Structure formats: C-alpha cells, structure tokens
Amino acid sequence: MRLNKIILSFVSALVILFSTSVASFAKVVGDKIILGAAISLTGKYSSNGVHTQNGYNMAVDRINSMGGVKVGGKTYKFDIIYYDDESNPKRAAQLAERLISQDGVEFMLGPYSSGLTKAIAPVTEKYGVPMVEANGASRSLFTKGYKYLFAVLAPANLYLDVAIETAVELNGGKPVRIAQAFEQDAFSQDVRLGILDAAERTGSKIIIDDKLPKELNDMAATLVKVKQMKPDVLVVSGHTKGALTAIRQIAEMKVDVPMLAMTHCDAAKLSKQHGKNSQYALCASQWHKSLTYKDDFFIKKSSL
C-alpha cells in the first residue's frame, strides 16, 4: 500500500477530532456523520486525486469496520460526499462553499496538492469547519495562522533535503554541485527552498536552477546543461507528470548523473512504467515498504 503511513495518521486525526467534538454540530444522517471532500477526479491531478479518494475510502472503511467513533455516548460511522474539483483551485473553493453552505457538511477532508488546499483553506476557516488534509505539504499553508487546518504529512521543504546530505556523505563529507528543476507551484517551490537550505548548510553549490515548463512534458533544455556541467546531484519536482518526463528523457538523452532525487515516484508508478530506467532514483515518500508496521486490514487491502 502506498498510503498506509499517511492513512494511519489520517485515521488517528479523524478519531481524535470526532471524539472531542459534539455530533450535534456535524451533518448526521441516521448513525452516520457525513464528511465532505473536493477531489481531483479529472484534470491535471486526476491520478493523484483517485489515490487520495481511495485512501480516504480506505480510512473510513477501517474506522467503520472497527465500530466507528463514540461521541457523547453514542456511536457513529462515517460517509463521504465527493465532488470533482477538476484540478482547478477556483472550482475547489466553489465546491467547498457548496459542501458547507448547501450540503451542510461540518467536517472536510482535504484535496490533492498544496495549491488546491490553499484555495479551500480560507473557505473552511471562514465557516469554522475543520479540514483534515494529507496532500497539502507547502509550508506556507502553516504560516497563515489557520485554526481549522490539520495536516498529517511532512512539509514540502523536508522532502528532498536529505538527498543533499546523503550526497555530501557519499562524497566524503565534501560539498557537492547541484542541478535542480522545479514546477512553478507552491509545493515544488517549497521543495526547492529545502534544497537551497540544505546546500547552504552543507556548503554545496547550486549550478543549475531551472523552471520546468508548465506542461511538464519536456525538460531537455535542463538535461542538456546537466550533460555539459556534470553536477553531482540532479533534483526534480514536477508532480507525477514531471517525474515521468524526467525518467523518460534522462534515458532517451543518455544523461549520466551520480544521483537523481525526485518527488512523486510512487504516484507515477515509475518502477512499473519505466523499469530499469527508474532504478537508483532517490524518491521522497511518506512511507516505505521496509517499515515494519502491518496488520490484517492493510495486508488484505494491499493484496486487492
């Protein structure tokens, strides 16, 4: 399972949130508390949105199978109202308004991506509706004083900084030369800031600092410079499409770089889609299969 670590935190967050809340303030149908979520089922983030929906459904299934949550001496289970935000921030904010003001939802689940989370957070704050989110990692989300935003993942600036530290360690403790290319979104720019911090901390040097094209379908210009300047590390963050483009073009252009560090390898299913070409890429992840946690629920779900 890709999401087990995040989902465990998500389950815990929901249980804590509801066990300390009053059910009369929630939308309740029978014995079910209704949650709301605007998710990217179409558009740029559709594959990640489906993963997010699957994760939320899995968490709710687990909570319900364990008997639900007790609030004020009464037991409740969960159900979720979903709308497709079309990977569009404006649409996401509109749907958050609809879920709260029309559907009566009093507890929200976050969308996919920092940008869409940023679009929805002001809406949930305005109405005082708690939102638990697992996919908005931009640290700027957590510097605005939001009182109703609860996240269960590491901030974006910590995703790949360890790659620079590892490269320095493998280089005998000496500084390294870094090439980097990033999408122009809140998440990727925070990943970039983490690399800049790591470079300063280790005395390393950024020799290529590029922007990925908006379509995320061609990074040849960056890779030409990588071949010419021969950095010790190449860092790429462009969500799922950017990861796929990077692996494909690195192979096509026969780029040889000692270390490649990227985000969204799991979501892009790199090992399945690109096989040996994706080997040895260092990838940011909220969990890893080598972690020892397991139980019957995750074993059964991961085998489906």
PLM features: residue spans?
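Short, low-complexity disordered leader/linker segments with a strong preference
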Residues: 1-34
